[in-house]
Amino acid sequence: MTELVGRTRARCVETLSLDSTGTRNALSAALVAELSAALAECGKDPDVRAVVLTHTGTTFCAGADLRDPPDPDALVALLRQLIELPRPVVARVTGHVRAGGLGLLAACDLAAASATASFAFTEVRIGVAPAVISLPLLPRTDPRALARYYLTGERFDPAEAVRLGLLTVTADDVDEALAPVLDGLRRSAPQALAETKRLLTARVLETFDRDAASLTALSARLFSTDQAREGMTAFLERRDAAWVV
């Protein structure tokens, strides 16, 4: 069976690489399950000080796999797992991030992207809403600034992602930018990192507790509609949806 998540370790930092380039690292049921299992192991391993979440290929994550979508509850659980993991999680992006991939990005504690990265909330263009991924996104960003991209599906660049609060830093050389960050995490006490992360994520988890059930239901309802079926079919057939004017 092909592994969908690569794993390496260097000086107590575990790197998890989304490795399903044939689907542009789309969130399939299998990839979500494998990533969740890897995170669970990292959370229990005392030799893991921090986790880097990155990717192979030119796309960090294309969002949900429309041919093999994950269960909405499983996606909520994965996002919550990233937030509750007692290790800092650092996103390292050198490519495109779309739709559900932005949920992964928002669930990480820190995020860095190279100048080649691009971002888009493409849900509205296939007839649905960025429902489940709003759980980590809206508490960590400026909703007013985010509204343009939520409502239009426009692409935006790393500098704009920093302004919105999606990214911590952008640089031509993302590894050079992350080097002092990872060094700082290696110098920090494990219990201090865990408790400091709890302080930083408390408000995000309140949103999960309050809204996860309703947003999961909204997502399921929207994906079952005629407009969503048309939008997904149009996407797979590489044509405009019927409502485009």
Q: What do these predicted regions represent?
A:
Residues 134-144:
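Hydrophobic, secondary-structure "cap" segments at the distal end of domains
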Residues 95, 109-110, 148, 152-154, ...:
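Well-ordered beta-strand positions
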Residues 1-56, 179:
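Conserved CoA-thioester-binding segment of acyl-CoA-metabolizing enzymes
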Residues 112-117, 167-213, 226, 242-245:
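C-terminal long alpha-helix characteristic of the crotonase
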Residues 149-150, 161, 199, 203, ...:
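Helix-loop "lid/cap" segments that line or gate small-molecule binding pockets
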Residues 47, 54-82, 207:
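Glycine- (often His-adjacent) and acidic-residue-rich active-site loop
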